[in-house]
């Protein structure tokens, strides 16, 4: 449901407008993207190539539209686009389908001058607590991931 004109993207724009509207000095400093699991496993009839092409096309359109709408409210001339991988435990169970989507995410973010953050070795909630939730990172892994995102943000801002 992510895509220009689709419900989740409309919600993203609504929330962005709301946040920016709270104070005229509010600025967008980065675009953090951490989605794609559903795109990896839904539409079983899609080949890996179709999954890749569809996801890349949707992300490129979304990121481009977002930049066009909000470039005047960005903190810097170039808005850092940062994305991350999936939980290892979930990824291993869905590797074939996920590789196409992850490749699309990586290439799209990098084409916008952004960075892709690796998530290998980070534990899921299930691995930490045994609760069956293998798609979300546990609290400790989220802290590590946040630090990795910030390092990517700093590197982009420095032009590396």
Where on the chain are the PLM-derived regions?
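Cell-envelope and extracellular/periplasmic
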Residues: 1-160
């Amino acid at each position: 449901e992510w895509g220009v004109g689709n419900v989740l993207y409309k919600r993203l724009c609504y929330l962005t407008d709301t946040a920016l509207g709270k104070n005229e000095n509010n600025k967008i400093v980065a675009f953090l993207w951490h989605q794609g699991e559903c795109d990896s496993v839904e539409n079983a009839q899609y080949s890996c190539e179709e999954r890749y092409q569809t996801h890349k096309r949707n992300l490129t359109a979304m990121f481009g539209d977002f930049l066009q709408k909000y470039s005047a409210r960005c903190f810097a001339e170039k808005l850092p686009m940062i994305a991350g991988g999936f939980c290892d435990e979930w990824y291993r169970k869905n590797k074939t389908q996920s590789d196409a989507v992850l490749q699309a995410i990586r290439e799209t973010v990098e084409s916008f001058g952004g960075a892709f953050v690796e998530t290998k070795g980070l534990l899921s909630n299930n691995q930490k607590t045994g609760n069956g939730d293998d798609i979300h990172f546990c609290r400790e892994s989220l802290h590590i991931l946040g630090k990795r995102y910030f390092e990517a943000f700093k590197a982009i801002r420095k032009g590396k």
